[in-house]
Amino acid sequence: SFRAGVSVRNRFIYGDLVESFPSYNDLISRDYGYLHKLTRNLVEEDSYLVNTSVDRLWMHYTRGSFEVRIGRQRINWGQTYVWNPNDLFNAYSFFDFDYEEKPGSDAIRLMYYPSYTSAAELAVKVNRDEQVTAAGYYRMNKWGYDWQFLAGILNDEEYVAGMGWSGDIAGAGFSCEATYIRPDKNFRDTSGILLASASASYMFDNSLYLQMEGFYNGNYEHMRLGSFRSYYYRPMTVKTLS
């Protein structure tokens, strides 16, 4: 069977920020995907602008346990809630909460489901600079936990390998993700980067829900953040999550 999906976001932005921030128009219309022309400003004036962006544009084919999706889509391999080192394709800032729809990738995704609790995937995306991110992914359930393993290449520049799991300990939810990244150039002479997150959650009898999460980013010293703005507006990748 075939399916298709389209989702468009339209924004009218008005205020002093548009006028006082000279590069704000370019920032709003910036799209890092291969199909970057799907985002543009329809109207640009001194104090307001009108922006449109195609969030999703895909075709999907299903035959038995096999599925293929082509186009702008969300590829979510995360297990934890706030920071997702395993989410190679759609990294996003947790502080960017003004829009519930998460970013998509311009990609081809192959999916196979051997059983109800297992899945194998292969995904390839191309960004605006024609850099390729490609990875394989396998998920299974064992010992009461959901386990996942992945490996691939990030933006034609780095090898990646990772794993994650989610389950519970004494009734409390427990999830972890870890990804190791190493440059493909001078592979033997360079050190890699470890990204890891851990999350714990618990719901009490009175429905009070508590959740805690921590994150380690081995790339932090190389991010050179001078302010919160320099973090918030920089291109998001799995290495710039913190």
Predicted regions and their residues:
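Residues on the lipid-exposed face of transmembrane beta-strands in outer-membrane beta-barrel proteins
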Residues: S1, R56-Y61, I108-Y112, G136-M140, ...
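Outer membrane beta-barrel
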Residues: F2-S118
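Transmembrane beta-strands of outer-membrane beta-barrel proteins
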Residues: F2-V8, V68, A119-L122, W147-F149, ...
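Transmembrane beta-strands of outer-membrane beta-barrel pores
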Residues: V8-Y14, R63-S65, R72-N76, V124-R128, ...
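Residues that define the transmembrane beta-barrel architecture of outer-membrane proteins
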Residues: V50-D55, T62, K102-D106, E130-A134, ...
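Outer-membrane beta-barrel strand-turn architecture
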Residues: S53, T62-S65, P114-Y116, M140-G144, ...
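Transmembrane beta-strand segments that form the barrel wall of outer-membrane beta-barrel proteins
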Residues: Y92-F94, P114, S118-R128, A134-Y138, ...
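Detector for outer-membrane/organellar transmembrane beta-barrel domains
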Residues: S166-S242
